[in-house]
């Protein structure tokens, strides 16, 4: 199959060029047009984005999302690869389930699926999974995300097992006892609203503990969704000590704060919770100075009925994978710059995983996205590919929407 994308620009260039793709690989730049031709409309060509943290809800919770809707949403957001979390029903802790998900996703024609598998059976925090068989089946990461690895000894054993396989463990780092019952960040806003708070110390204490387990084992650890300044300081210190630690930040922890909860709207309820503007600004500095390795969304869809419940009862999570890049480009593009932002959403995740960094040179795999960096569009969740057709950014005007996403040399998304 041959595709030519015309009328595009490279990152950092104003020159209009074309790119030809053949049999899943980049054939070259500015060659005679052949095959199916797509007009890039003057957009900027970048490697397809990589998502290390998404909840696709299949199997068992497909009323919230499924592989087809979640991967279609990812493709519409410019993503070429998605690592799905294992906190499904049943939990992704069986090699046969890993293989089944990969095979099903392959036939959908959207973003590439790379399943994460659980560290412990059933994510119960007790008995380790058969990590070697899960890796052989295609699992790319181990995590009990959704739970918090309360048992330090089990986490240590899991990290040692993962290390022997050359794999990374990813952690949702919050202390369950400290965060118990909290529905939002503990601070002046929660106090003024009379809502139970989840203190920043719950996240910081768990990250600090986990850094010591890294020091003990020498195993690679990836810390999910930093939300506080103190967590970032702890990770920075671990990196200065030479520990094999990486971390991610989510757009919602940069753009939204606990002030949003003044509406008592559970759409803003996430775990870890939205923190203060000072925390968000500090995390942005971590992106700028390289302390934070990558951006991930923690795409976590729920049904509208669930998110319309009282704050105390509603589940945590925001789903917005198809507008993640526009949020980051519109809100923080001026501070970060395009090259840095693209790196944080492509090469950064690849480095965390130990994958080859994406390339747009001849011979490289044809995973790419054409981005419209200039045109403002109003966010309309009714147009989302995701089943979660609601978002905190509804009605806001953003720039940076994908025009075309190509995965393995095939069109996975094209904006109509």
From Swiss-Prot:
Enzyme active site: 298
One cellular component term from this protein's GO annotations in UniProt: cytoplasm
Short name of any one Pfam family annotated for the protein: Amidohydro_1
Reaction catalyzed: (S)-dihydroorotate + H2O = N-carbamoyl-L-aspartate + H(+)
GO biological process: 'de novo' UMP biosynthetic process; purine nucleobase catabolic process
Family: Belongs to the metallo-dependent hydrolases superfamily. DHOase family. Class I DHOase subfamily.
Protein known as: Dihydroorotase
Species in which this protein is naturally found: Deinococcus radiodurans (strain ATCC 13939 / DSM 20539 / JCM 16871 / CCUG 27074 / LMG 4051 / NBRC 15346 / NCIMB 9279 / VKM B-1422 / R1)
